[in-house]
């Protein structure tokens, strides 16, 4: 049973990454112009200078944040499918509902984790107290922390999903 679940999650992850690449290439083809390309290059150079990080590091960090966010959405949807298909009636509606609830709980866990860290870190707590722009080091710390939090959430949700799948549920 665990192998079936892992094959489904792997196929979903591959489809997600393929979709991300196709969207990026499509946007590049549709919107490419020398002016836009120069604008993006100048913006990346400027932002990487402000954050004291290489352009590659900047792009990698943001791609990682987006990827773990989308993976959280993916595993939340799978959780919704598993819980929804355990019921006899309204499987699709319940799958969407449980998926949304799982995703909302994951986002609340991220927010709660950031708040808990903010209790000991005044820089991060500024997110909750003011609308001022964050210090560069605080923002970098926050991005790295969020990546770790999302990875923990993804692992926990997958452990729950494997447990539910092993108990028996027909998702075909």
Model-derived regions: residue spans:
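Junction motif at the cytosolic side of a transmembrane helix
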Residues: 80-92, 152-172
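Juxtamembrane non-transmembrane "cap" segments at the membrane-aqueous interface
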Residues: 32-42, 106-128
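Short, membrane-exposed interhelical loops at transmembrane-helix boundaries
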Residues: 45-51, 120-142
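Central hydrophobic cores of alpha-helical transmembrane segments
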Residues: 92-105
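Helix-loop-helix units of permease transmembrane domains in multi-pass membrane transporters
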Residues: 1-13
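Hydrophobic alpha-helical transmembrane segments of multi-pass membrane proteins
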Residues: 63-71, 100, 148-152
């Amino acid at each position: 049973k665990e192998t079936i679940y892992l094959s489904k999650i792997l196929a979903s992850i591959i489809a997600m990454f393929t979709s991300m690449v196709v969207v990026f290439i499509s946007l590049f083809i549709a919107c490419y112009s020398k002016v836009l390309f120069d604008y993006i290059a100048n913006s990346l150079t400027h932002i990487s200078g402000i954050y004291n990080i290489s352009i590659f590091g900047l792009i990698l960090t943001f791609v990682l944040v987006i990827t773990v966010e989308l993976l959280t959405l993916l595993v939340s949807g799978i959780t919704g499918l598993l819980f929804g298909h355990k019921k006899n009636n309204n499987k699709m509606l319940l799958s969407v509902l449980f998926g949304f609830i799982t995703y909302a709980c994951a986002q609340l866990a991220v927010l709660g984790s950031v708040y808990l860290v903010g209790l000991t870190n005044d820089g991060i707590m500024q997110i909750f107290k003011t609308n001022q722009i964050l210090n560069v080091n605080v923002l970098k710390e926050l991005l790295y922390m969020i990546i770790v939090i999302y990875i923990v959430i993804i692992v926990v949700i997958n452990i729950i999903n494997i447990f539910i799948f092993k108990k028996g549920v027909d998702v075909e």
